[in-house]
Swiss-Prot record:
Pfam families named among the record's database cross-references: Shikimate_DH, Shikimate_dh_N
Record HAMAP family: Shikimate_DH_AroE (MF_00222)
Keywords: Amino-acid biosynthesis, Aromatic amino acid biosynthesis, NADP, Oxidoreductase
Organism: Pseudoalteromonas translucida (strain TAC 125)
Reaction(s) this enzyme catalyzes, per UniProt: shikimate + NADP(+) = 3-dehydroshikimate + NADPH + H(+)
Designated gene of the protein: aroE
Annotated protein name in UniProt: Shikimate dehydrogenase (NADP(+))
Length: 274
């Protein structure tokens, strides 16, 4: 049976094994997919041992995506630009291919929820790895502009410069963020994980059509509830669909078969994935 795994720290609450189990069942396949705790100071050796023992592919989650990028022998064009890898595949010649499926999973979830991207003004809160992974896939759909806001303005500006040749993208600190009508606001920070709000002024959300929190939750996150408090018409989405979407794209990278996403998202939201 082909072996796969997800590596992270912490990892015990990962839904990836249950998600990939459902993918395999739906496609009539059998795989062995496990969650593996990688020591903070020993990620590369842990992953190398897994592949040396016959592993076919791996997912990589926090905080190891940059290390996975560094250890890949070959990178997809998107992974190369993003500078982070969440999917590793052992190729026929034994080398490791690094890919990043986060952005594709994110955009596929937006489209599945009938969220319009083209011609829209988009605000991304945060300038870390999660934001970095979604900017280019968003720009591929030709929004009016993508604005990145971060506590450290320089980090947002540097991220914007990285993608400037691909579309209209800019970066700001919270204190000088332009008061534009943002149709789609994305919280890419981990604030909801800690039950905290990003430092965004409420004036920026009054005309928001869609608020998306990348944090996966069975209930509305603190960010989603905050937006709803000031704008009851806003469509609220959490990271469930992105989680399943990026996993489906990883499955496709490994096995050249694309699983159906929506049934697994529904099972995840109902707490039925074990």
């Amino acid at each position: 049976m082909d072996k796969y795994a997800v590596f992270g720290n912490p990892i015990k609450h990962s839904k990836s094994p249950a998600i990939h189990k459902q993918f395999a069942i739906s496609l009539g396949e059998q795989i062995d997919y496990r969650a593996i705790l990688a020591p903070i100071d020993n990620f590369e050796k842990t992953v190398s041992n897994f592949f040396a023992q016959g592993g076919k592919g791996a997912n990589v989650t926090m905080p190891f995506k940059e290390q996975a990028f560094a250890m890949a022998d070959e990178l997809t064009p998107l992974a190369k630009i993003v500078g982070a890898v969440n999917t590793l595949k052992k190729q026929a010649d034994g080398t490791l291919l690094g890919d990043n499926t986060d952005g594709i999973g994110f955009v596929s979830d937006l489209l599945a929820n009938n969220v319009s991207i083209t011609g829209k003004r988009i605000l991304i809160i945060g300038a870390g790895g999660a934001a970095r992974g979604v900017v280019l896939p968003l720009l591929d759909h030709q929004p009016q502009e993508v604005v990145i806001v971060n506590r450290t303005a320089e980090k947002a500006q540097n991220l914007a410069k990285l993608f400037a040749q691909h579309g209209n993208v800019s970066g700001y600190g919270f204190n000088n963020l332009p008061e534009n009508d943002y149709a789609l606001i994305i919280n890419s920070t981990s604030s909801s994980m800690n039950d905290e709000l990003p430092a965004l002024d409420q004036k920026h959300i009054t005309n928001c059509e869609v608020a998306y929190d990348m944090f996966y939750s069975l209930q509305n996150t603190i960010f989603m509830n905050w937006v709803a408090q000031y704008n009851s018409k806003t469509k609220l989405l959490d990271g469930s669909g992105m989680l399943v979407g990026q996993a489906a794209q990883a499955y496709y990278v490994w096995r050249n078969k694309m699983p159906a996403i929506l049934p697994v998202v529904n099972a995840l939201k109902q707490g039925a994935l074990t």
